[in-house]
Design a protein with these regions (language model features):
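Alpha-helix N-cap/helix-initiation sites
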Residues: 12-13, 93
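His-Asp-centered metal-binding catalytic motifs of divalent-metal-dependent phosphohydrolases/nucleases
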Residues: 1, 17-29
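Divalent metal-dependent phosphate-bond-processing catalytic cores, especially two-metal-ion Mg2+/Mn2+ enzymes
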Residues: 5-6, 28-157
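Ligand-binding beta-strand-loop-alpha-helix segment within the catalytic cores
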Residues: 9
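Alpha-helical scaffolds flanking conserved acidic
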Residues: 13-22, 38-45
Length: 157
């Protein structure tokens, strides 16, 4: 966006601003506040698509735990169903756990269904140490997924 190259693809200022908003918010911790429902919907769509793509790209590199485990703070956040500060990742297992925590930031049930159908979540779970505390987080996550998959997305009415 800084170079303005994307303007070569849009003549309509409103569409350009919509795409700019969605792309600029695709990897932020939270979507920038807006009263524009269309902007918000597109930002959510791009964020979900980005997560699905990252799960796909990283799947071939997923391997068993390297024995370093997950940082206790990350496990606590996972058990609570919350997000974490990515800058505090210390281990390979932290990286895996972050990808599980992303599920709580997937906006559309359709997106989550794609993630579930590709087995991304279970593959990550199977490559983490599953102690008692981790199992609490996994149970919470699976329950959340089941609930989320029952919701209707905005285009479903």
């Amino acid at each position: 966006f800084e170079e303005g190259l994307i303007k070569n693809f849009w003549n309509n200022k409103e569409d350009y601003e919509l795409i700019e908003f969605a792309i600029k918010n695709h990897n932020k911790i939270k979507i920038e506040e807006t009263n524009n429902e269309r902007y918000l919907a597109f930002a959510k769509l791009i964020r979900d698509a980005d997560k699905i793509d990252i799960y796909r790209v990283l799947k071939p590199f997923l391997g068993p735990t390297d024995g370093t485990g997950c940082s206790p703070d990350f496990v606590d956040l996972f058990v609570a169903g919350k997000q974490c500060d990515y800058t505090k990742m210390r281990t390979q297992d932290d990286r895996k756990l972050v990808r599980l925590m992303w599920v709580y930031d997937v906006y559309f049930a359709w997106s989550l269904q794609q993630i579930v159908e590709q087995n991304y979540i279970e593959d990550i779970i199977n490559n983490l140490v599953q102690d008692e505390k981790m199992m609490q987080g996994i149970t919470r996550l699976r329950n959340y997924i089941q609930e989320k998959l029952q919701t209707k997305d905005i285009w479903q009415g």
